[in-house]
Amino acid sequence: MSASMYGAGVEYALHSMLILATQSAPVSVSDLAGYQGIPERFLAKIFTRLKNARLVKGMEGVAGGFVLAKPAENIDVMEVLRAVDPGRSLFTCAEIRQNCALFGETPPGWAVSGPCRIHAFMEEAERKLQTFLASRTLADLVCEYSCKAPKKFARETEGWFLDRKKDRVARRQAGGSGEL
């Protein structure tokens, strides 16, 4: 397995927001984590970042949870990446061009003047990646996902979340904890 540019947090955020985009009611972090088999504490931290970036908003109460803060077609993938994994760069230049064994202690001006060509190349690649990610929305991902999954899967997913919410509300009304 190779190292990735973006961490698991980005994957968790995008999958969770995809779910929020397809649900008719707020969804709790606990339910999102349980549904996807991912760590709840980590997902809660991700949702704090998403909320601070105004991509999701929280709804209070035992039947509460999170909803998208704006329509899925108005949330681009780059916004999610910036919220969850801010400051991540495709490439970090260590300026090794000045360390060539042939240069000794003083590299010639031609070797170190201007920007490093490798760095400039990688910055261009990063700009193109960011432009692509900014051109794709959460709604695009929902559409692609919906085309792949059978129609009944959307109903089953909605039912799974509604059943969890009903169970939580019933436990709260019976005097137990509403949390799962």
Ranges and model annotations:
Residues 41:
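Key DNA-contact positions within bacterial/archaeal DNA-binding proteins
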Residues 34, 51-52:
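Alpha-helical residues within the helix-turn-helix
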